[in-house]
């Protein structure tokens, strides 16, 4: 998972600035389906030249995953999410691996001097994802209503840039963007054109889990503040809380429980009790959030261990 902790704490390694230069040719696509559970690696150029996707695959819902700083497209948490999407909902999952642009080669040194480069690269990766989406729509006849993006940290903002670009390309809007603890550093005062924003898809869902490494303002149609969005149970490091957003969504995809969000106006107000929840006032985190009418900010109580349920057995 990506780790912005040393950046936020100001404990930068004063070594040589890493080279995290973006090059589209470095991007790989990890493609998962029920008959390719461990994933295959493709390049966009190959997709242009060969009819690789079978009609039976491409007709499914498609989830495009985008990782964050210092991470990879097949990181452990994304791999678990991809397998859950395949198993439960028979998705076609495409994980965008932009590890070089995300400075993954320097992850072992914990050198975050390349963070500003990675931030700049998010726009390039967003354009890449939009161009890939155009290929899916025009060559493979995939409707935009079948495509959702799921991005963690810098990947959340990258998803936003992709959402803006597909609209510029006149493709319409993605069905949904799910922003998993959208990155805070370099985005703390950003306006909509420069970050993930609720207009970037038909529905934008944000799951906030770290006030240190993530943004603490609303960016979506619904914004879930898990455990008040500050830090997470069982986590002593901000990076642990930051990564929990990915794990929470994966458990919600498995549908072992519903993480319920109850309306919450601000950090200084007391959220309503889960026991008072009705389907028209509260929202379940996850792939079905869009089916609930309520929008805005929601407080989500969680337990320390998976599947993290703290919903008093309530069914919405």
From Swiss-Prot:
One example GO MF annotation: phospholipase A1 activity
Enzyme Commission number(s) from the entry: 3.1.1.32
Propeptide residues according to the Swiss-Prot or TrEMBL record: 5-14
Signal peptide (from-to): 1-4
Annotated catalytic residues: 153 (nucleophile), 181 (charge relay system), 242 (charge relay system)
Cysteine disulfide partners in this protein: 20-103, 192-197, 235-240, 257-284, 258-309, 277-282
GO cellular component: extracellular space
GO biological process: killing of cells of another organism; lipid catabolic process
Pfam family, one: Lipase
UniProt entry keywords in alphabetical sequence: Allergen, Cytolysis, Disulfide bond, Hemolysis, Hydrolase, Lipid degradation, Lipid metabolism, Secreted, Signal
Tissues in which the UniProt entry reports expression: Expressed by the venom gland.
Reaction catalyzed: a 1,2-diacyl-sn-glycero-3-phosphocholine + H2O = a 2-acyl-sn-glycero-3-phosphocholine + a fatty acid + H(+)
Compartments where found: Secreted
Record carries keyword Disulfide bond: yes
PANTHER family per record: LIPASE, LIPASE DOMAIN-CONTAINING PROTEIN-RELATED
Functional note: Catalyzes the hydrolysis of phosphatidylcholine with phospholipase A1 activity. May act as an allergen and induce hemolytic activity.
Family from the record: Belongs to the AB hydrolase superfamily. Lipase family.
Record-given protein name: Phospholipase A1 4
Annotated source species: Polistes dominula (European paper wasp)
């Amino acid at each position: 998972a990506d780790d912005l902790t040393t950046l936020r704490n100001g404990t930068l390694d004063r070594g040589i600035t890493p080279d995290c230069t973006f090059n589209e040719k470095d991007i790989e696509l990890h493609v998962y389906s029920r008959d390719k559970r461990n994933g295959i690696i493709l390049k966009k150029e190959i997709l242009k030249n060969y009819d690789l996707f079978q009609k039976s695959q491409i007709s499914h819902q498609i989830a495009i995953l985008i990782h964050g700083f210092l991470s990879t497209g097949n990181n452990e948490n994304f791999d678990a999410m991809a397998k859950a999407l395949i198993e439960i909902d028979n998705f076609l999952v495409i994980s965008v691996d932009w590890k070089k642009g995300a400075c993954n080669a320097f992850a072992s040194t914990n050198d975050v001097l390349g963070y500003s480069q990675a931030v700049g690269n998010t726009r390039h990766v967003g354009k890449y994802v939009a161009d890939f989406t155009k290929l899916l729509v025009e060559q493979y006849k995939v409707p935009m209503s079948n495509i959702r993006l799921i991005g963690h940290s810098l990947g959340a903002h990258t998803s936003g840039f992709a959402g803006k670009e597909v609209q510029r390309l006149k493709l319409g809007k993605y069905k949904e963007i799910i922003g998993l603890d959208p990155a805070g550093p370099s985005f703390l005062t950003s306006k909509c054109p420069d970050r993930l924003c609720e207009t970037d898809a038909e529905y934008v869902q944000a799951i906030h889990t770290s006030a240190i490494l993530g943004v603490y303002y609303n960016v979506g149609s619904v914004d879930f503040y898990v455990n008040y969005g500050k830090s997470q149970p069982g986590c002593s490091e901000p990076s642990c809380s930051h990564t929990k957003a990915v794990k929470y969504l994966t458990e919600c995809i498995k549908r072992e429980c519903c993480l319920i969000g109850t309306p919450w106006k601000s950090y200084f107000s007391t959220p309503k009790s889960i026991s008072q929840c009705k389907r028209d006032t509260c929202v379940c985190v996850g792939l079905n959030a869009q089916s609930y009418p309520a929008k805005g900010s929601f407080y989500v109580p969680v337990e320390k261990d998976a599947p993290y349920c703290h919903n008093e057995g309530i069914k919405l």
